[in-house]
Amino acid sequence: MLHTQQLTTMLDLQQKMNAKVNPEWINAGYGFMRAAMVESVEAIEHHGWKWWKAQEKDLPQLQMECVDIWHFALSHILIEYQSDVEASAKVIAQQLSESETALTFDGNIYKFAQQDLLNNLELMTGLAAAKRFNVSLFMTIIAQCEMSTDTLFEQYVGKNILNFFRQDHGYSRDLGGKS
């Protein structure tokens, strides 16, 4: 499970990145959950779902998409708590400790452990489209992507450093791919 210090570090880094892009980011109305939804769909693509086409699951790319989703989810949570890093960390830690195992969405009950990765990614996509994020569902997906929370933390910090580099040197797709 992510520790409070890890959460605080990630939220602080995310807040600094967002402020670097736009000092008024908190009130800019950016579609962070829309971005998380797009990343979720990209994760589905990397999982492979087309029955008419031979596809293999690209686990490293799936993991990278999860890290991208986490960036946008942290931004969404920071906005909900008026950019208060400590309050945001506290609410995430509380959600992690509660370890929800299911949620109701659109009148249906979804039990995370009874769904495979692809179905959990679809559920996360639907939630993101509805501007909602469920930490427990995300952590289930992280586990299904064969990542530990420490790996999520390490990859998040690494990607954040890359994003700062991109901002400092003019964001370009030839600096290492997508955001």
State what each model feature region is.
Residues 1-179:
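Flexible "arm" and connector segments at domain edges
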